């Protein structure tokens, strides 16, 4: 099975992402329900602009984070570590992402928070169900200029 396909299938079954931002030497992490877009390899989250992590992110910022399950045994551990970039969406891009997010989490209709995209540029997927310490890696291909 292709690495990104395996990662995408697993992420589709999860729902909480943790991401961390850094600003002027200070670190802060946040958790949120996410919608994963396998085509763009990105999470969509809702978070208020007044939160500490949004203030530290500004309109866009580098991020690192994790998604993991809560297995009761080491043999069932699965999860990702990632790095990428978070940015606040605007206009039609925001509207489209919000509609997709609301299909997955209808209760979020009550939350007027902006939509943010976390674009994943590097992923390490640990899957102990395939053997202890089994790791898969994915890197976004650089865009070549003409």
Curated annotation (Swiss-Prot):
Cysteine disulfide partners in this protein: none
Highest taxon, organism lineage: Bacteria
Listed SUPFAM superfamilies: FMN-binding split barrel
Similarity annotation: Belongs to the UPF0306 family.
Record protein name field: UPF0306 protein CKO_04548
Annotated source species: Citrobacter koseri (strain ATCC BAA-895 / CDC 4225-83 / SGSC4696)
């Amino acid at each position: 099975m292709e690495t990104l396909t395996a990662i995408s299938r697993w992420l589709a079954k999860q729902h909480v992402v943790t991401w961390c931002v850094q600003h002027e030497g200070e670190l802060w992490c946040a958790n949120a329900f996410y919608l994963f877009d396998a085509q763009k390899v990105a999470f969509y989250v809702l978070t208020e602009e007044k939160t500490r992590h949004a203030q530290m992110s500004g309109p866009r910022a580098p991020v690192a984070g994790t998604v993991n399950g809560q297995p009761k045994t080491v043999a069932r551990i699965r999860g990702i570590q990632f790095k990428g970039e978070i940015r606040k969406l605007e206009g039609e891009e925001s509207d489209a992402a919000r509609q997709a997010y609301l299909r997955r989490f209808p209760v979020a209709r009550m939350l007027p928070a902006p939509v943010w995209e976390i674009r994943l540029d590097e992923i390490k997927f640990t899957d102990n169900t395939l053997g202890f310490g089994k790791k898969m890696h994915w890197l976004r291909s650089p865009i070549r200029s003409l």
